[in-house]
């Protein structure tokens, strides 16, 4: 039974790290090359390691809720994590709301959601992220907005800063 279970698990995709190949901002989808090879048996009983085909039309997940969304640029080469839905997402993706899956596939490479941001060690954020504040920052930390636990707000930019408001601005 354990052998049968392991055989079934080989066909079950859950999550894989990847690299953005291209991004379509209007559709909010990406093409992703996974960065872990797939193991397949060769005809002689050996094992080959092959690239998983590029995953296309994968929805990008931007953190959002309550009418607000955090967005950021996405470019080729950005590292990501692709999480595969346990059921076909096509009906939901096209129409929103509760849908009957148009296909009975499960854990398919066709049903991946992309979280941009997980990083391998060579591409980790340096300098390291703050351990005491929330930051919106550039990777090189040359520009940032920081909110601290002491309720302070700090902003830094080597360039110009502008604020446009239809009401009062207090600094």
Regions found by a protein language model. Name each.
Residues 1-159:
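Hydrophobic packing positions characteristic
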Residues 164-171:
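Short, intrinsically disordered, charge-balanced linker/junction segments flanking boundaries
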């Amino acid at each position: 039974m354990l052998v049968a279970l392991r055989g079934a698990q080989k066909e079950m995709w859950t999550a894989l790290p990847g690299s953005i190949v291209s991004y379509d901002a209007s559709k909010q989808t990406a093409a992703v090359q996974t960065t872990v090879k797939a193991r397949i048996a060769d005809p002689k009983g050996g094992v080959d390691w092959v690239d998983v085909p590029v995953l296309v039309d994968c929805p990008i997940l931007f953190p959002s809720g309550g009418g607000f969304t955090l967005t950021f640029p996405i470019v080729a080469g950005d590292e990501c994590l692709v999480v595969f839905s346990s059921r076909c997402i096509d009906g939901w993706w096209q129409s929103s709301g509760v849908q009957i899956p148009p296909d009975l596939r499960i854990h398919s490479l066709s049903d991946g959601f992309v979280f941009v941001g997980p990083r391998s060690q060579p591409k980790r954020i340096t300098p390291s992220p703050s351990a005491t504040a929330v930051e919106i920052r550039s990777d090189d930390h040359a520009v940032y907005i920081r909110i601290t636990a002491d309720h302070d707000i700090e902003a830094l930019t080597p360039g110009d800063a502008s604020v446009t408001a239809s009401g009062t601005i207090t600094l």
